[in-house]
């Protein structure tokens, strides 16, 4: 079973409120895969906990997803103030010899907004009423 089919079978959906099926979002070819690890919601630390405690799994999954989408550039975008998370992910990238890179975002709200993230990471601007895919990016 392909990775895309596994994602579909698992019923994975986005957490942005609309519940958009992840397999549909990732069924594309892009230049950039950006993993949104900015975690802008006040008092939430789930992503941060995962980055510290499951860093190798995150890096491996990002690399696999990047390969699946044909991404030439794979980034985990997180806030520059996340020192422990940056250290854990950096070690995981080295240990796994992964093509994944970290992008350190400024610590502001809403750093995790898709349009802001695309612009910060790639320098590209998503057109009005557009989506990141319009400029060769997918955010996960």
Could you say what each language-model-derived stretch is?
Residues 1-11:
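Short, hydrophobic/aliphatic alpha-helical segments
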Residues 9-27:
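Conserved phosphate/anionic-ligand binding catalytic regions in large, soluble enzymes, centered on
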Residues 23, 43-45, 113:
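Short helix/loop capping segments that flank catalytic or ligand/cofactor-binding pockets
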Residues 27-36:
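Structural signature of FAD isoalloxazine-binding scaffolds in flavoprotein oxidoreductases
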Residues 35-47:
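Gly-rich Lys/Arg/Thr-decorated short loops/hinges at beta-loop-alpha junctions or inter-strand turns
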Residues 52-68:
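Histidine-anchored nucleotide/phosphate-binding helix
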Residues 67-75:
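Short, surface-exposed connector motifs at secondary-structure boundaries
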Residues 75, 81-140:
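Hydrophobic alpha-helical positions that pack around
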